[in-house]
């Protein structure tokens, strides 16, 4: 039986991302369980879960060949999980790094935006790419509201890993929004969207390193 993957480049990249997240969960959670408290373990579990959800939903959406109505549902889930990943990445920072007042306030804001964003995607999946990217990027940089606290609390190494992840995600979001021909290779299965996928994975790797070294 021949198996057909609808968009091989996009499906494979984020299937790899999902597997990397699953594999990375063990050392991260073991380290947190040994050296950190229950709140850290909970927050890091949310972070890992958000990565698995995003990469899993994306891999499935880009893999399946089904009728349009079902494919549209998978597409909505794919886009909705981006909000989950962003909020999930914020969660350990809010609960472990920041003080209670700033942390819980920021946590409520980002998860509030995530819920609104998911509802928007569920109702308006055809919104322009620039609009989606603007929301994703803006949500990602809400942390500027606590820049001073992060700068004063984190070591320079920790701050740089956190910042690097944000920058890489942002570059990927711009590539996704603009879909410039320069990013499209002669291979039809690997173009600007697949490059966007690689940038998302790069951002996740930076943030995983940050979580493992400085949060767990």
Residue locations for each model-derived region?
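Multi-pass alpha-helical transmembrane bundles in non-GPCR membrane proteins
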Residues: 1-216
């Amino acid at each position: 039986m021949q198996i057909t993957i609808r968009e091989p480049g996009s499906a494979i990249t984020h299937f790899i991302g999902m597997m990397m997240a699953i594999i990375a969960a063990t050392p991260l959670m073991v380290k947190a369980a040994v050296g950190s408290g229950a709140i850290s373990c909970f927050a890091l579990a949310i972070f890992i879960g958000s990565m698995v959800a995003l990469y899993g939903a994306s891999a499935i959406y880009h893999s399946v060949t089904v009728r349009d109505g079902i494919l549209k549902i998978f597409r909505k889930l794919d886009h909705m999980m981006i909000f989950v990943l962003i909020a999930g990445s914020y969660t350990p920072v809010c609960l472990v790094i920041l003080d209670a007042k700033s942390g819980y306030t920021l946590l409520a804001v980002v998860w509030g935006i995530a819920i609104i964003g998911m509802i928007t995607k569920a109702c308006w999946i055809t919104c322009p790419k620039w609009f989606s990217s603007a929301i994703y990027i803006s949500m990602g940089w809400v942390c500027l509201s606590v820049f001073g606290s992060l700068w004063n609390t984190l070591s320079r190494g920790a701050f740089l890993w956190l910042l690097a992840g944000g920058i890489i995600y942002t570059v990927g979001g711009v590539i996704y929004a603009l879909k410039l021909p320069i990013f499209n290779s002669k291979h039809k299965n690997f173009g600007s969207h697949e490059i966007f996928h690689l940038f998302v994975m790069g951002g996740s790797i930076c943030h995983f390193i940050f979580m493992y070294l400085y949060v767990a």
